[in-house]
């Protein structure tokens, strides 16, 4: 028996999954300040499993590890450099296990070596992020210091002008904790519409004439995703493929259609009939499209299991 643990944040300490020992746990704890809600709980989970299953080999897989290959110009913020040196404030990204899994699968599906491919992977769910994958390595991603950054999400704001935050804090007399709650749990599509924070409900409402805010929210969602994809064409110096994954990416037909149609100028042509599927692996671009688009259901558990098996076999 072997056991794999998903860890939200590995900071700059982990660029791949790691065998769990006392040193690994200490390192996870040392970056807990970057994920205060997740890393301490993950350590408790690891220790509980160690107590329940003594001697069973365990491996930690990090959501941030895949993005440790980003070049410095893509992760350093344009603020005083000392804050990076003192506090580790930089872009870390998230959903790395998912982005890596679907990028590898895309290469398999098109029958090409991933080292020769430029792919944009779109993990779209309650939390959502976009990743530029060059030769199998992450070189840019939309989430930042935390999973709050990037595209507008169901309850998260995504990227904002920082003065929006200070203005609201002053006007509403909010504490840092209060504004953190506002931006993480009360913003995004939910904040715009006031509807239940369920993407499916918001999308359905967007087709109703008396729900203009729902239509606005969906337009913002698909537009910002398309903008990030276009932006990553610069990072990658071209795009060979786009992958949609995650609950929204795999199941919301019209969302994929809207995003792809916004990118027609890049030579992406969507096959309307092929796109009419939910939760299935499918090519959704036409044969004459300059960019190949796929739906690829993610399987983070399988990816973690594979890493766990490989690492445990190495140390035997």
Model-derived segments and spans:
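Glycine-rich phosphate-binding loop of actin/hexokinase-like ATP-binding domains
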Residues: 66-171
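Phosphate/pyrophosphate-binding loops at sites that engage ATP/ADP/AMP, CoA/4′-phosphopantetheine
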Residues: 1, 106-113, 229-240
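Oxyanion-binding "anion nests"
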Residues: 169-195
């Amino acid at each position: 028996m072997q056991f794999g643990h998903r860890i939200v944040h590995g900071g700059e300490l982990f660029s791949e999954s790691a065998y769990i020992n006392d040193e690994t746990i200490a390192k996870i704890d040392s970056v807990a300040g970057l994920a205060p809600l997740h890393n301490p709980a993950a350590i408790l989970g690891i220790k509980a499993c160690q107590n329940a299953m003594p001697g069973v080999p365990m491996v930690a897989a990090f959501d941030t590890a895949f993005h440790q290959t980003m070049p410095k110009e893509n992760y350093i913020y344009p603020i005083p450099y000392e804050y990076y040196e003192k506090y580790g404030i930089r872009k870390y990204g998230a959903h790395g296990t998912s982005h890596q899994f679907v990028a590898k699968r895309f290469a398999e599906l098109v029958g090409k070596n991933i080292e020769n491919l430029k792919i944009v992977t779109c993990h779209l769910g309650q939390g959502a992020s976009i990743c530029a994958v060059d030769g199998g390595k992450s070189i840019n991603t939309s989430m930042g210091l935390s999973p709050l950054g990037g595209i507008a999400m169901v309850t998260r704001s995504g990227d904002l002008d920082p003065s929006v935050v200070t203005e609201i804090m002053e006007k509403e007399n909010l504490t840092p904790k209060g504004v953190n709650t506002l931006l993480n749990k009360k913003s995004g599509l939910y904040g715009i519409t006031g509807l239940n924070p369920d993407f499916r409900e918001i999308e359905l409402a967007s087709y109703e004439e008396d729900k203009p805010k729902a239509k606005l929210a969906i337009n913002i969602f698909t537009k910002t995703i398309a903008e990030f994809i276009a932006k990553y064409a610069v990072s990658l110096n071209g795009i060979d493929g786009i992958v949609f994954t995650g609950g929204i990416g795999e199941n919301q037909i019209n969302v994929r259609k809207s995003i792809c149609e916004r990118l027609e100028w890049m030579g992406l042509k969507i096959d309307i009939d092929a796109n009419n599927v939910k939760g299935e692996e499918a090519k959704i671009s036409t044969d004459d499209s300059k960019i190949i688009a796929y739906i690829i259901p993610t399987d983070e558990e399988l990816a973690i299991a594979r890493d766990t098996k490989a690492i445990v076999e190495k140390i035997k």
